[in-house]
Amino acid sequence: MKHRHILAVLVPVLAGAQGGLQPADLHRLKAVGDVQLAPDGARAVYTVTHSDGPGRPTSEVRVMEIATGTSRPFGRAGEGVSGARWSPQGDRIAYFGREGEKFGLIVARTDGSEARFVAEVLGTNHPLPTSGERLTWSPDGRHIAYVSAAPGPEADANGDPMVITRYLYKPTAGEGLTRFNDNRRLHIFVAEVATGRVRQLTDGTYYEHSLDWSPRGDEILFVSNREPDPDRFFNYDIFAVRASDGVVRRLTETKSAEYNPTWSPDGRTIAYLGTKRDLTSSETTMEDTHVWVMNADGSNRREVVRLDNRQGAPQWSADGQSLYFTMQDHGNVHLYRQSPSDGQVMKVLTDWGTVGSWSLGGDGVVAYAYTSTTHPAELYVRARTGGPRRLTQLNADVLTGRRLGRVDSFTVRSVGGREVQSFLTFPAEPRAGAKAPLIALIHGGPHGQQGPAFNASAQVYAARGYGVLMVNYRGSTGYGQEHADAIFGDQNGAEAQDVLVAIDSALIRYPWIDADRLGVEGGSYGGQLANWLVTRTTRFKAAIPRASISNLVSFNYTAYYHDYLAVEFGAFPHQRGLMDTLWARSPLRYVDRVKTPTMLVHGENDNDVPIAEAEQFYVALRDVGVETVMVRYPREGHGLRETKHLVDVLERSMRWYERWFQVQ
């Protein structure tokens, strides 16, 4: 057992305090998303996401004057603006939005006036994610390159009958189970801003994304998977396409993957994210991405940031002498700066919390979204010298006067001597001498992390008087490559023990926790672990697996990506006897051991973890006589998005816990 950090203190109760956070408050919470500084560094355009309606969150775009902190809306209300990017001259903003029934590329003055629809943009329901920039300006501001699906009929898989020929035949999670991959490919188009004339630069059976226009104006960087069967091998490489005639040259040809390329200011060097291992899946990988650079012709590829943690997309300083990048670190996401010439690394933003979207100005100013344990993401700015300055107070009307639970961090030595860090949220209003329930809230991935960021679910539970424990079990990121690799071939193994050991440690460290009122929940892989844990122990009074896997064999063949387990176990199920191993590591195999009342939560349109995983476990639990209920949310994919559903599941969860915590 090791050190403990106090990450936040109780928000003081002000006059007229309203208690802690309530489920209905989710309708009022807002968060800063995408952040982009103007070329002069004096203004920032940023998105604000809010959930004031019953449906999915919506976003608005605003422009902030950095010096004064004054903000104004950009674009028409309800236009669905996204991807806003400044022109190189700083006099216009390009963005994606709607004009009537059409969705496309729009250019406007920086005050939102003179908005003009330049080109229609089409999408695809192809399931695997793309990364990086969707649009990029030419240096002279006369053209914009963007990503769009090529026009054309959809695939026969949406007809009657539905004819399936692709390996990845299912769509994104939100499309539903009766619609299939439309087979539209994403390609690069260039629009002339003045006339709206559009040229298609790339074609074929591939997908392009992650754009960056060269400083000389002659080429556009992009990322694409050009394997003979892109559905089977997600090997992303970096290419450049000539803006004048669409001639493509390949810059990398590795067995690993490259992402987010960006030109240096002089156009001689390209920085990007890369991995080293042979890659088979982009849905999840235990290998951390690191920052690399190469010459503009693709030669002299080298890893420049040799820090043992997962790094985010790099940006160049204006003089080209430094690279900035984010990196996960023990539950946090910090911003760093490195000089490729001497390798020296300096921390730029180091506060406990998470740096989200960020943008670098010419004079070293950084504008960024930042969340801590006490607030969702707000807009901040930091000059080259001096400390951070907060520019927005989006949630003052919700959080002022609310009592939030403070958050501790502690590290425990788990099985095999592995150190595992956990974060514990206290009850918002603890009662002296009283015991409180504890909910183990398990993150998904498994290659992800939890940390000192605002967690609305944890704070709602804290307001009810619960403690909430989040464990960065082996397999989590933010603790080095060896820690992320430690789950390889061992799902539902030692990482489940990490959670139980962390609970044991919490019971010793915090005497206010009631060992007789423990709950467990998690989403996706966290839901899988919740399912597994109730087959291993009866110590939990109630369980709430969300979007959970119960049968690793059926999951492998029904999810929209079919090689995730091949990555995690080193073989496909039909190889090396893995089918038997997967069944042996499936919670469904041991359902007769379950005694814990279980509420299964799932989106009906989930193609990531199909709802059949919840259906199997639900019927099996009923067969063995366990108190169980399945809550199915229509229109939802992998994870709930509609605000009314988020509120509903929190209210249901608390009722479920309260019901079973009272049973002795």
What are these regions (language model features)?
Residues S51, M470-Q664:
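Active-site-proximal cap/loop segments of hydrolase catalytic domains
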Residues I66-G69, R109-S113, E192-G196, R242-G246, ...:
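Short loop/turn segments that connect beta-strands within beta-propeller blades
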Residues Q18-K30, V198-Q200:
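A short helix->beta-strand "capping" segment at the edge of beta-propeller domains
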Residues E227-P228, L394-D516, E521-G523, F555-H562:
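Cap/lid segment of the alpha/beta-hydrolase catalytic domain
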Residues Y146-A191, Y236, T275-K276, E283-H290, ...:
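Predominantly five- to eight-bladed beta-propeller fold
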Residues G55-E60, E101-I106, E154-D156, R185-H187, ...:
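Structural motif
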Residues K30-V45, R76-F96, K102, V121-V147, ...:
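Conserved beta-propeller blade repeats
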